[in-house]
A protein has these predicted regions:
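Hydrophobic/aromatic beta-strand patches that form the interior of the parallel beta-sheet core
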Residues: 59, 85, 111, 159-164
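Long, mid-chain structured domain cores
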Residues: 1-25
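Generic detector of short, locally flexible boundary/turn motifs and exposed helical patches
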Residues: 22-28, 38, 73-79, 104-109, ...
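N-terminal pre-Walker A segment at the start of P-loop NTPase domains
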Residues: 17-54
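Glycine-rich phosphate-binding P-loop
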Residues: 57-82
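Conserved nucleotide-sensing/catalytic segment adjacent to the nucleotide-binding pocket
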Residues: 83-150
Length: 177
């Protein structure tokens, strides 16, 4: 065996050792990572590693309904020892927040926004809260980022990571408008 180069392992390398395989990364877009439903454990670990990093991070998660997007975000937050807050969600019932209380403004929180719910919401206070949260130096996770960017000034280029979660490899992620 001949070594040609040594490098410090990245968190993707550590996850590959832990789970026995590398995370699939888009060849054309290096910030896009693909997972299947059977890989939820790997996805949760991946999110937890991202959530452990300090500072602003904007993560988008694409996927059809009932594939495990929200549950993975919450589980990743728990693994990273971070508190999670729904700004908008459909996990238990439809949640649309229009304000946060004093203790909920924290760089150590993970803010979860359902882009489909927020895109349909007409309450200006909710839209103002979303804008406020987007400026915080913390982690924001947007489900359905493609729908989210249709109704505000953000673009896909603003996202640091895009995660695609599918039932199976060939499932298409499509949205009805």
């Amino acid at each position: 065996i001949e070594r040609t180069k040594l490098r410090m392992p990245e968190f993707r390398d550590r996850l590959a050792v832990r789970h026995g395989r590398y995370i699939e990364q888009d060849a054309g877009d290096k910030k896009t990572f693909r997972f299947e439903r059977e890989d939820l454990g790997l996805l949760v670990d991946f999110l937890a590693e991202l959530f452990k990093e300090d500072g602003h991070k904007l993560i988008g998660i694409r996927g059809m309904p009932r594939v495990g997007k929200t549950e993975s975000i919450v589980a990743g937050s728990v693994c990273a020892h971070k508190r999670w807050l729904f700004i908008s969600s459909t996990l238990i019932k439809q949640t649309v927040r229009s304000s946060l209380i004093k203790g909920e403004y924290d760089a150590n929180h993970v803010y979860i926004i359902d882009g489909a719910v927020t895109a349909r919401e007409t309450n200006p206070k909710h839209q103002q809260l979303v804008e406020e949260v987007m400026t915080l130096p913390s982690i924001k996770v947007v489900e359905h980022p493609d729908l989210f960017i249709e109704t505000n000034q953000y673009s896909i280029d603003d996202f640091d990571y895009i995660i695609e979660l599918r039932e199976h490899e060939n499932q298409k992620i499509e949205y009805d408008h």
